[in-house]
Amino acid sequence: MKKLPRSPEPAKRWMAFLINHREAIAAMDFFTVPTLTFGVLYCFFVIAHDRRRILHFNVTRHPTSAWVIQQLREAFPYDSAPGYLIFDRGTNFNQEVTDSVKSFGIQPKRTSFRSPWQNGVAERWVGNCRRDLLDHVIVLNDRHLKRLMNE
């Protein structure tokens, strides 16, 4: 009896998905920024995969799922939503956020647990942002961080 050929490794399938649909993919994520007063700011961003451009970002001290949903409304006005939205399994991206993503007509794609390589475009942008900007500036508050990020 012949054995059926094995399916490609999950990593290869994921990479094929990213390459084949890059024009229709956006990713969202958070990263933390320490402040001068030892507080922590959370920077939320949405990035397009095709040109690696930031579609939307905002800063908050206390991210909630309701706040994330509002940011998604601002990121995708009217019919500008991508086909797929990649995000990790962070506590802020709960079932409420997943349901609202579906209501926008976007297919949510959650990455595997502790697999930052699956959201490489977003993780790369976070690394560049830290190296090029945040390693050289001490952030005072959320307004200061927003101004720095706009530049």
Task: Locate predicted features.
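Charged DNA-binding/catalytic regions of mobile-element recombinases
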Residues: 1-151
